[in-house]
Amino acid sequence: ELPAIQNLGAMDVLCCDKTGTLTEDRIVLERYLSTDGNEDARVLRHAFLNSFFQTGLKNLIDLAVIDRADVTPSTVVPDSMLGQSLRDRYTKVDEVPFDFSRRRLSVVVADAQGKTQMVTKGAAEEMLEICSFVEIDGIAQPLTDEKLAQIRKQIAGLNAEGLRVIAVAQKTN
């Protein structure tokens, strides 16, 4: 198309939709990482609980999380996908809706034994501001300045790859 090629000379910026967000109206969950940078099913589990049980319109990120959990095998329920396993084992108790000043959304869920947990998902920087502990190898530890710097460096690296980083945190009652 000669006219299209001629127009390229007049362009200052060319934007490409390499992820399909604009052209396909969808997002794909690429990674679910713990604070040490390793893939961690607990991160996907908490993100799923938040995305699935929130009552508002599900945005593209929520749908990507739900889709990924629906094709990821459960480590708890044999011959089951993670998403279905979590749907069957948890019920929603309460919700703090997303708002643009907090830049996060929280849901409270309960398991069959009545044990509750609040799961919050939101913009990484805002989430880091409200967290005082970090889970390392399944153990909650104080979020030190050194660990915070390491997490921020990890986020910057992911952003440099063109990935949008969302953080998820949980607090068990």
Task: Indicate residue ranges for each PLM-predicted region.
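Conserved cytosolic headpiece of P-type ATPases
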Residues: 1-173
